[in-house]
């Protein structure tokens, strides 16, 4: 999972189109949320919803700015990416070819106790955050529907 995040961040350096950059940012956020779900499901869910809302607004804005641009892939720039990815795998995980159950990785059943360790104070904060984000979503929808024009013309 960490290797996929490193690979996506390497490819983000080579992207020259904003929509491809937005898509890779979305995939990277999704992978980080999947990694965080083992620690706390609520934090990963809230992080995903916040990033998804921001990325969707950014996607609408960027797609209205660059509607007819084509993707241009430069294959020569990928020649240095492959050795960098292999080296990053070797540095981040010295035994990435030899994964075994005795390598010290935690299984999802080890995190059951952590997931249920939510007290009433943090649940109240999560509830307020969810209500606040929902109200912000409703306000943005109402603002966009009241003008009945594209997002680009508002700027």
From Swiss-Prot:
It catalyses: a ubiquinone + NADH + 5 H(+)(in) = a ubiquinol + NAD(+) + 4 H(+)(out). The keyword Mitochondrion applies. It is a multi-pass membrane protein. One of its GO terms (molecular function) is NADH dehydrogenase (ubiquinone) activity. The gene is ND6. Core subunit of the mitochondrial membrane respiratory chain NADH dehydrogenase (Complex I) that is believed to belong to the minimal assembly required for catalysis. Complex I functions in the transfer of electrons from NADH to the respiratory chain. The immediate electron acceptor for the enzyme is believed to be ubiquinone. The chain crosses the membrane at residues 1-21, 42-62, 71-91, 121-141. The keyword Electron transport applies. Belongs to the complex I subunit 6 family. It is found in: Mitochondrion membrane. GO terms for cellular component: mitochondrial membrane. Its EC number is 7.1.1.2. It is an enzyme of class 7 (translocase). Its main location: mitochondrion. It comes from Artemia franciscana (Brine shrimp). This is NADH-ubiquinone oxidoreductase chain 6. It comes from the Eukaryota. Keywords: Electron transport, Membrane, Mitochondrion, NAD, Respiratory chain, Translocase, Transmembrane, Transmembrane helix, Transport, Ubiquinone.
